[in-house]
A protein has these predicted regions:
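Amphipathic alpha-helical packing segments from all-alpha helical-bundle domains
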Residues: 114-141, 151, 178-182
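Short, basic, alpha-helical segments at the C-terminal edge of helix-turn-helix-like DNA-binding modules
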Residues: 59-65
Length: 193
């Protein structure tokens, strides 16, 4: 067997962008080989199929997203501030001319009618993210309340990621967050924002 001359992570980073922009169905093997510089045989040997490559890309994206949540929580003065900063970052990202939303949410939307393994995988990653928020919120609230707040937060995140495609939506999103997540303003005594 020939030694592979590529790094799996580099390939995944390239295809994350491609799949994220185009979606699963609209991305061809030709586009993938052009973006990665690899031949189809190398891709199939490493990932078994286009579906396997897509799932590996989703997993890498989810890992980055989860790491970003933990980093934000670790660097903020409170869970309140971390959540606010993350929501503001999502809104800022939506202002970009090359805005792509969330890869996991876009996958859910694209593949919802099929309910296939990729859809289920994306859903599982989003559930995992919700549980991470739940764990952090549970430090401040009783479990039942924290669970409701984590679900509310995910609903707002989904909304930001989708509504972000609307031009000039940042002010509307900020006002909506304040209306939908009033508990966020009272979570921390040291919040001055």
């Amino acid at each position: 067997m020939a030694k592979k001359n590529f790094a799996r992570e580099d390939v995944l980073d390239k295809v994350i962008t491609l799949f994220w922009q185009n979606g699963y169905a609209a991305t061809s093997i030709q586009q993938i080989t052009k973006a990665t510089g690899l031949k189809p045989g190398s891709l199939y040997y490493e990932f078994e199929s286009k579906e396997g490559l897509f799932q590996a890309a989703l997993a890498r994206y989810a890992t980055f997203s989860i790491e970003a949540i933990h980093l934000s929580m670790a660097n903020a003065s409170s869970v309140n501030n971390a959540i606010k900063q993350m929501l503001n970052t999502l809104i800022e990202q939506s202002k970009s001319c090359d805005y792509c939303g969330c890869f996991l949410i876009k996958t859910q939307l694209e593949l919802a009618s099929q309910g296939n393994q990729l859809y289920q995988f994306a859903s599982a990653q989003l559930t995992k993210i919700e549980h991470i928020y739940l764990d952090y919120l549970s430090e401040y609230y009783p479990q039942i309340q924290a669970k409701a707040y984590a679900a509310q937060l995910m609903t707002v995140i989904f909304g930001i990621r989708i509504y972000g495609y609307q031009a000039e939506s940042a002010t509307t999103q900020i006002n909506t967050i304040s209306a939908l997540l009033p508990w966020l303003a009272t979570l921390s005594k040291d919040d001055n924002s």
